[in-house]
Amino acid sequence: MVENHGVPLATVEIDVKNGSFTQTPEYEGLAHMYEHMFFRANSAYPEPNQFWDRASDLGAIFNGSTEEERVNYFMTVPTENVGNAIQLLASAVQHPLFRQDELERERQVVIGEYDEKESSPFFALDQAMKTKLYPGNFSRKNPIGDRRIVATTTPDKMRTIQNKYYVPNNTALIIAGDVNPTTVFSLAEREFGNWNRAADPFIADPIPAIPPLQKSEGVIVEAPVGAVTIEIQWQGPSVGQDPKATYAADVFSDVLNDPQSQFQQRLVDSGLWQAVGVNYYTLNHTGPITISGQTSAEQLRPSLAALYGEIAKFDTPGYFTSDELEAVKAHRAVTSAFDRERASGFAHTLGFWWSVASLEYYMGYVDYMAQQSLGDLRGYARKYIVGKPHIAGVLISSDERQSLKLAPDDLVMAGAR
């Protein structure tokens, strides 16, 4: 529970440790499908649209999202309706009906979302990269899912997900905003107090570890695009196994993304790249490290060679400076403080970190970031990036690929030169 009396609103959020990371190929996309069914009929609101009508009566703004390692559902309401919002979400999480007629309608909605994503060439590149970066485990990194699985899912499969993952000991209730702690704890006890614990799903059925990437590969996706997009990915740290590296990863990315960094000056200010960015996505099951940007077809080979030249120096003393390090630490502390000012956004942030890592990890985040040294950044680069297997992808038009005589091996070979 987070008090914030800035405006007379409150956000009620439910987070579940579910998402694509729990999906075998037979369930690919069903964590997302379940998210859609959450806002449909339940035992307290058994008719179609009753849930939505009740939410409208409360003046609620509500939604959900499915990611790799978290599914969340939230509802922002005027303060006086927070108790009703808790009741509405409690009924949805504990007593869904999974009506066949609603399932059939929501299938089409989800397939429509898939079609929309599929129309983007960047989605095609993203999917191709994930397939190579996580061989044999694509279903666990694909929240949008498999169209065939979504189109043929049944209420029984929804019930299987509910019984396994939608249990109180795998769920967090977060309430943030203009609320009284005593009141909301009493309301939460009233609505959730009789919800019985179940077996820990990750003890009963442990999630297998993502196997290390064994070799570097190139990926080329052809589409009618103007600029050429280049993306290089590595398997990064898992927050549960190497939390220290995740702090170094964020500082590392911040330093390289600073427009004044040597990295940006040599790649972007030189004119080789139109833009280039570095990111680590924190996950408990092998988050990706990504360097991506855009250039022209004429500059593709020199741009890639220059990038690989920078990557080779990431673990070299002197590549990062103390001034760069302290500047990004201060900036991250300020932005983290600002992020906590908006109650609804803070609820989402807390839910993500509870699901992926822990609240203790999040509450110590700024302090641990501040402790990172130049040696920590070099150690992170040495352990996860420099000389490590990677996937290099390019999104390019067919004509430009043909003109360049570009082959997938060219993308990796550039890094070996």
Locations of regions flagged by a protein language model:
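Short acidic/His-enriched helical or mixed secondary-structure segments at domain edges of catalytic enzymes
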Residues: 56, 109-128, 208-227, 262, ...
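A structural supersecondary motif
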Residues: 231-235, 256-295
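Buried hydrophobic packing residues in well-ordered domains
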Residues: 14, 32-33, 55, 73, ...
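An aromatic/glycine/proline-enriched structural segment found at the starts
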Residues: 135, 143, 168, 172-239, ...
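Scaffold signal of the M16-like zinc-metallopeptidase fold and its non-catalytic homologs
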Residues: 85, 92, 117-167, 188, ...
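M16/insulysin-pitrilysin zinc metalloprotease superfamily fold
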Residues: 40-44, 76-107, 259, 280-339, ...
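M16/MPP (pitrilysin/insulinase) zinc-metallopeptidase core fold and M16-derived inactive scaffolds
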Residues: 6, 11-76, 142-143, 257-273, ...
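C-terminal regions of mature proteins
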Residues: 172-174, 292-294, 323-417
